[in-house]
Amino acid sequence: MDSEATRGLLAEAARRAADYLEGLDARRVSALPGAAERLAAAIEEPFPEGPSQAAQVLATLDDYGSPATVASAGGRYFGFVTGGALPATLAAQTLATAWDQNAASFVSSPAAAIFEETALRWVKEVLGLPPGAAGCIATGATMANFACLAAARNRVLAEAGWDVDAKGLFGAPAPSVVVGEEVHASLLKVLSMLGFGRERVIRLPVDSQGRIRAEGLPELSGPAILCIQAGNVNSGAFDPAPELIGWARRHDAWVHVDGAFGLWAAASPELAPLAEGYGEADSWATDAHKWLNVPYDSGIALVRDPEALAGALSISGAYLLPSGRRDALQITPESSRRARG
């Protein structure tokens, strides 16, 4: 496709996108009746043996796809703590898509590395988290929790004399993983992915708002990880961090904060008391595609000790020479990844 045709196609995409956004306040929030069926029927065909016209592909995408979307980008959608996208972030993502960068390393994209490093620094500043913490921008809180708890797993087992990176988990000491009775389902998924299992966690009793009760906490021995919530998904309540973290420190436990939406309370002078003590944890996971209204997907993982994060997620290869700058593939679950900073 020549440059003029490309410009025309991008202009048409921008026009269709603007029309979609302008219509959000007038359309129903859920997909339009019958839209999903019409979309499925429109693309029910074998894999094409020849090329398709780009303009026609775009038209099909919009004409059949847009009515089958949920209006979560609009102001009348209140489901699942789903954010929209501010105009500036939508425009920035459009440009970033045109760049088509692999944000794996500084060498593959200096711009992506610098933007991500700056964005994470700002997040630490506004949330009052340790400036020396290492972090990555992942797909969402699930993978942010994964990155943080991978660091936690490897660190607590290393302190027990077990090298997970070299030996795996077979034969390793069994860490105690402590959560509240109303732990978020995605965190249990992460614990399963990391080899802890969903059913062998220690579940602490909670109050009527889903907060972990700080009285009568059990004694622990050996490697341990405590997961607390900054914002219960059903009530918005915060676990009592000062008491729980104090208990965890007496047992040499790693403390992780699942703060997908609630951790941002720390950025508000009015709401910051809710997040009191959360900055004393060892790792934090949150989302940018909720309160910050950046386009999906964008989760944030931060770990107090950079060596713990790198120790769990680093990669080596003859063609992967360290740049001396931010190489995201050394501290993120993914290697190939889009620019999210």
Regions found by a protein language model. Name each.
Residues 216, 238-250, 262-281:
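Active-site pre-lysine segment of PLP-dependent enzymes
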Residues 1-132:
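N-terminal entrance/gating region of PLP-dependent enzymes' catalytic architecture
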Residues 211-256:
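Active-site phosphate-binding strand-loop segment of PLP-dependent enzymes
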Residues 82-96, 102-221:
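PLP-dependent aspartate aminotransferase-fold enzymes
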Residues 232, 276-341:
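Active-site C-terminal subdomain of aminotransferase-like
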Residues 147-150, 189-192, 237-240, 265-271, ...:
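Short acidic, glycine/serine/threonine-rich loops at helix termini
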Residues 183, 232, 261-263, 290:
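Active-site-proximal loop/turn and secondary-structure-junction residues that shape catalytic pockets
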